[in-house]
Amino acid sequence: GYGARSRDVIKAIIATDKYDVKLLSQRWGATPFGFCENHPEFKNLLDLVVPMPLAQQPDIWAQITVPNEFQAVGRYNIGFTAGMETTLVDGTWVEGMNRLDINFVSSEHSKKSFLNSVYEKQDKQGNVLEQSIQITKPMEVLFEGANLEKYFAKKVNPNLQLNLSLDSIKESFAYLSVGHWMQGQI
């Protein structure tokens, strides 16, 4: 989810050793805090958390969340979002993406969904205005993949042939569902 993605992005930025990184903690729904305290490899991130309000405007502001929550706070503003598993996104998401200088999404499908989302802008009387709502800011795909060294068994049957190509799927339409079944009221 967004928490794991945030930690991955932060670790990668810190690893460049080019920036003075500061973090703001952001609540996500009813998700509990405490991940960093319970995972020693991330405990160092707690030292980077700064209190609100910010003492000064950041040079670079990066926000990792759903686009309707994007706010331009820094001199240069970057958005990271997974997007939506659909063909069109809501107009408020398009407007959120346009508030920032550049946005990163996690798949070509997500990027296409944003680019295909074009809406007529109307005034309060319902009159169509000349201006439309559509993505006007740069958007790039920041691929998130699986580490095959970690997620495939170390000992593979040499007679087993793994076909990792989606081109081999014979059906003209296929739906992939990935989820985690959990008990309610967690």
Predicted regions and their residues:
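Hydrophobic anchor at the start of a short beta-strand
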Residues: D20-V21, N77, M139
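Hydrophobic residues at beta-strand termini and immediately following loops
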Residues: L24, F80, V141-L142
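Donor nucleotide-sugar binding/catalytic pocket of nucleotide-sugar-dependent glycosyltransferases
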Residues: D101-L162
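Hydrophobic alpha-helical packing residues
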Residues: I13-I14, F114
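A short beta-strand-loop structural module common to alpha/beta enzyme folds
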Residues: Y19-P32
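Extended catalytic core of nucleotide-activated donor transferases of GT-like folds
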Residues: A30-S113
